[in-house]
Curated annotation (Swiss-Prot):
One biological process term in Gene Ontology: glucose metabolic process
Cysteine disulfide partners in this protein: C8-C37, C20-C50, C36-C41
InterPro entries with a match to the protein in the record: Insulin, Insulin-like, Insulin-like_sf, Insulin_CS, Insulin_family
Lineage: Eukaryota, Metazoa, Chordata, Craniata, Vertebrata
Organism of provenance: Batrachoididae sp. (Toadfish)
Gene3D superfamilies reported in the protein's UniProt record: Insulin-like
Main location: secreted
Quaternary structure annotation from Swiss-Prot or TrEMBL: Heterodimer of a B chain and an A chain linked by two disulfide bonds.
Stated name of the protein: Insulin-1
Compartment(s) of residence: Secreted
Keywords of the record: Carbohydrate metabolism, Disulfide bond, Glucose metabolism, Hormone, Secreted
Family from the record: Belongs to the insulin family.
Length: 51
């Protein structure tokens, strides 16, 4: 598994598409940017935004 990373902008959206796949995701910019851009996040953090 990959170590936690800072993901911002298009990198964050690409990671969500990769993790969530066909389920899609809900995009709450304030929450996910705070969690994954300002601080490093891991795959489990990203999965919490999947539908």
């Amino acid at each position: 598994m990959a170590p936690p990373q800072h993901l911002c902008g298009s990198h964050l959206v690409d990671a969500l598409y990769l993790v969530c796949g066909d389920r899609g995701f809900f995009y709450n910019p304030k929450g996910i940017v705070e969690q994954c851009c300002h601080r490093p996040c891991d795959i489990f953090d990203l999965q919490s935004y999947c539908n």
